[in-house]
């Protein structure tokens, strides 16, 4: 089932899983190949979320970054990877600021949690703390 399509993205639901295919202006190496599909590593996906967050504030990206930083990678690792992938097009300082700025968030895409829901204030408090933590 196709959910929606824009100029550079198309969103599907395949076997109850939301899948997005996008055209991306940067060349990224695929770390994983699953059933013939190339996928970036989790760290590269986190870096792409960091890059996107500076230009668009979608709640789903904050939620994804919350889980990635809570369970997998530090903000330092994500910023380092984003610098490698995007060079001067990425600004780590702006990313850190955006992690603690919640006034213009777009909530149009509902977040569906696997397992227990996490309350919004838990996510915002965690990300704010991370954004102010020393490198």
Which role does the model predict for each range below?
Residues 1-135:
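Compositionally biased terminal segments of proteins
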């Amino acid at each position: 089932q196709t959910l929606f399509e824009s100029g550079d993205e198309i969103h599907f639901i395949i076997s109850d899983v939301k899948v997005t295919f996008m055209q991306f202006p940067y060349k990224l190496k695929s770390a994983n190949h699953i059933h013939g599909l190339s996928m970036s590593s989790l760290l590269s996906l986190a870096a792409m979320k960091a890059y996107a967050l500076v230009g668009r504030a979608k709640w789903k990206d904050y939620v994804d970054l919350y889980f990635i930083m809570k369970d997998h990678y530090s903000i330092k690792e994500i910023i380092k990877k984003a610098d490698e992938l995007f060079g001067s097009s990425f600004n780590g300082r702006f990313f850190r600021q955006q992690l603690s700025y919640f006034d213009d968030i777009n909530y149009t895409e509902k977040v569906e949690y696997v397992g227990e829901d996490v309350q919004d204030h838990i996510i915002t408090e965690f990300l704010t703390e991370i954004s102010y933590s020393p490198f």
